[in-house]
Each structure stands twice: as C-alpha cells, then as structure tokens.
Regions:
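Catalytic-site neighborhood detector that most strongly recognizes the C-terminal catalytic loop/helix
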Residues: 14, 22, 78-80, 111, ...
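C-terminal secondary-structure termini that scaffold catalytic or DNA-interacting sites
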Residues: 69, 80-82, 88-101, 108-110, ...
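Gram-positive cell-envelope targeting signals
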Residues: 21-22, 56-59, 149, 170, ...
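Basic, Lys/Arg- and aromatic-enriched nucleic-acid-binding interface segment
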Residues: 2-62, 67-68, 99-101, 135, ...
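Short, basic (Lys/Arg/His-rich) helix/loop patches that form interaction surfaces
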Residues: 33-38, 50, 104, 120-130, ...
Length: 243
C-alpha cells in the first residue's frame, strides 16, 4: 500500500487572472459622445462613473434614489440565467455580497440624467397606453415600451458599437476597471475606492482594478531617475569634498 499520495508533490499550474483593459479619461469622454442618444448610453455612463457591475446597472430601482438627500443606493440586481435552456430575467433584491450594497452621492449631472429618464418613462407610458409593460415600473433602466434592458444586451451591443466606431476593444465590465483606475490616478485612497466599488476586501481592489496607464509608468520612471540623479550628485559632492 502506498503511504503517500504522489499527486501531493505535483505542482499545480497557477491560475492566471484575467487582466482587463481600461479607458483613459479622454477615451471615456469620446465614448460618452458616441453613445449619446443610444439605448446603451445610460448603462455606459452609469458603469463608468459609479463603477457598477452590469447586474447592478440594470437592477437600479427608483426607490434606491433619494432626490432629497442626494444619494443613490446600490441594493438591487438583475441576473440573466438559463432555465430549461432558455434565458430568463431574475430580479434580486440583493447584491453580489454584503459590501456590494452601498450608498453613493447623487451628483448633479447624474441626477439630471435620472430626471430625464423618469420624464421619458412617464411620456412613453402615456403614449403606449395598455401596450406598455407594467412588470418593471419600479426599475429605472427600461426601453420605450417598459421592458427591462437585459444584461446580455449591454454586453453584445457595447462590443458591436465599439467596433462600429473603431474604438479600442474593452469589455463592458472594463468600464468598472476604468472607473477604479481613474480614481486611483486622482489620488483617491484605496479604502475609499473599495467602498465606491463595493468590494468585500481591499485586496480585490488593489489586485484587479488598479491598472497603471502609460503616464503613471512614465511618472514612476521619472521618479526613479530623479533618485538616481540625486545620488549621483551627492556622490560627486562627496568626491569633491574628499579632495
């Protein structure tokens, strides 16, 4: 009988984590411009500014917005899953983790977007009459006839639209990465970025969402050069003193 398991000595391959791409501030501004008036515009702006997950974007409800206190609470999601081989919409009154439930400030530009969304919904409901879908009246992100915007729609439409406009390829989820990276570049503390994104651990924030852009790398290189130049100057000074 073998006393030890030979497999215990086998070194398993390391799991490589996917490293997404990110957009710079300039690229995000260009992105917002090309999506103006597009059905996916609200999803793109929300994911990029608030760093929301796809399920959180489509799961936003009106009761999560407090126009008086100027806050928006991320507490609902919508999942899309297969049931008997068919994709089904599954609303959830909970987020991915406990820490994912978070309250964020409702800034003026985004408040204007929400007010316009609500106005459009009211107008569409009057125009459509009995044809208007009443299943998702509590939700913010619906189409002209009141149907919820499906998570898969955001993914596929986003990809196709980028290709159509010759924009660098990123996933819809990479808008969340871009949000975190821009916050990091602006000097926002990692703990605050963690709270903004709703991560359960700060390690997730640090390891996944702090993609350094080229400018950050150049700044780091210049800092090293500065240190080396300083040391060279000091060394020369010491040499002169020794004479």
């Amino acid at each position: 009988m073998i006393q030890t398991n030979p497999a215990d000595k086998v070194e398993l391959p390391r799991i490589e984590k996917y490293s997404g791409n990110v957009y710079s501030q300039k690229q995000l501004e260009e992105l917002f411009n090309i999506f103006k008036g597009n059905p996916a515009e609200f999803g793109v702006v929300t994911a990029a500014f608030y760093g929301l997950r796809r399920s959180e974007v489509v799961g936003l409800k009106w009761d999560a917005v407090d126009f008086e206190k100027k806050t928006i609470t991320i507490k609902h999601t919508i999942q899309q899953t297969k049931v008997d081989g068919k994709l089904q919409i599954v609303p959830c009154d909970r987020t991915k983790t406990k820490s994912s439930c978070r309250t964020l400030p409702l800034v003026a530009p985004y408040e204007e977007i929400l007010l316009k969304m609500r106005e459009n919904q009211e107008e569409n409901r009057k125009l459509c009459g009995s044809c208007y879908c009443t299943d998702y009246l509590d939700y913010i992100y619906v189409n002209e006839i009141g149907e919820i915007i499906k998570p898969d729609y955001l993914t596929t439409h986003f990809k196709a639209f980028l290709e159509e406009h010759n924009m660098p390829h990123i996933r819809f989820h990479d808008l969340r990465h871009s949000c975190a990276t821009l916050l990091f570049a602006q000097g926002v503390p990692m703990k605050e970025i963690q709270a903004w994104l709703g991560h359960s651990t700060i390690g997730t924030t640090a390891n996944i969402y702090t993609h350094l852009d080229e400018n950050s790398k150049i700044n780091s290189a210049n800092a090293i050069i500065g240190i080396l130049e300083q040391k060279r100057t000091l060394r020369a000074f010491h040499l002169r003193v020794s004479f």
